[in-house]
Amino acid sequence: ATIYDIIIPTSVGITMPDNKLAHVNSTPQDKAIKKIFAKLEKSVQTISLYDALMQHRQEYVYYRTDHHWTSKGAYYGYVGICEKLGISPHALSEYEKKKFGSFIGTYYGDTNGDKNFRKDELAAYYPVSDKISMKYQNESGKIVNGHVIADSSKYGISNKYLAFLEGDNAYTVITNKNIKDSSSCVVVKESFGNALVPYLTDHFSKIYVIDYRYWNGKLSHLVKDKKIQKIFFINNISMTRNSYLVGKLNQQIR
């Protein structure tokens, strides 16, 4: 299998105004990503999404009140991945877009923000293919049916991001019956990957999604058993400073 390492910058590196960023004691994220990539084995294909997002920094690519990227930001990340893979991305206009209402996320919660603060809006773009199904392992270990994009309009205002893959489930399998070949991949991710995977579903007959924070399997076994062709490691750059997460990931790839 071919291994791809995909690093997503955070909003600090993309949308923070330059005059504010100058006062932040932090290495520029594009340089940090290059430094990380330089330490990887030569066989690993690297994909930095820094430039893809920086080109659209004036657009609504990150939430204001949350640490995640928006569905539109994830779309630009998907375009960057397609360029690396040599496949044609769908145009944004090809997707059906739905809005699920106001959203306030982790930044708001962490700062006990003013109730009058301008809220985010959570929107999602549905896959172009019309024969996509999803199953995932819930917290009790049971395999249940789910949706790649779930209607989160009735969820609590802080839970709207659960629209993507129905949240952070340990193990998810997505099937696209419109694709007749045997193309498959595994996505090893944290929550930033949730908004990105729906775009990838149009290009693979099977996608296995692993949230390494909760999964306890061995990646090598899964790749061999399912005859997986591509492995995508998808992380936001701040994950690298979390020794617990690095340790969890290390356990699964050994």
Model-derived regions: residue spans:
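Extracellular glycan-modifying ectodomains
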Residues: 1-254
